[in-house]
């Protein structure tokens, strides 16, 4: 969710629209429309760009406590639900420290968002060494910079 600035994404979307691509936003496939309905509407192809996959839970004590959430939820609440605003229906809890469990690109995005949200110290907790982290080196570098 942090990989590209919104202005770049908006520019790329405009380029696609100029080529005749129809972009449908605010659509929850399965609730607003089904894939079958899209084909019935005349679409010949459907690309679902839903971002990162479902979160993986570790089934450990404490993972359902207040203040613990998946990176997907955290990033969605910040980017789409404006949870960084105090008047948000579901504001993000502000803390002095945050632990991000995982070593992938989404974990790096969550760590960077936590810093941007004012968290003093962010720890990335990963089961292996830094060299084995699946996050792109560029993502790791940006996370360390922030």
PLM-predicted stretches and their roles:
Residues 1-146:
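Residues forming the flavin
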């Amino acid at each position: 969710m942090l990989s590209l600035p919104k202005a770049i994404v908006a520019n790329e979307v405009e380029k696609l629209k100029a080529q005749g691509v129809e972009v449908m936003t605010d659509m929850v496939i399965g609730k607003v429309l089904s894939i079958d309905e899209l084909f019935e509407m005349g679409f010949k192809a459907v690309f679902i760009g839903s971002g990162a996959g479902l979160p993986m839970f570790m089934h450990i004590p404490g993972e359902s406590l207040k203040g613990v959430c998946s990176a997907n939820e955290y990033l969605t609440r910040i980017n789409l639900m404006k949870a960084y605003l105090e008047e948000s229906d579901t504001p993000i809890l502000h803390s002095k420290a945050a632990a991000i469990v995982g070593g992938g690109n989404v974990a790096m995005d969550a760590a960077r968002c936590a810093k941007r949200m004012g968290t003093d110290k962010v720890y990335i907790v990963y089961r292996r060494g830094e060299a084995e982290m699946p996050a792109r080196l560029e993502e790791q570098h940006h996370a360390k910079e922030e």
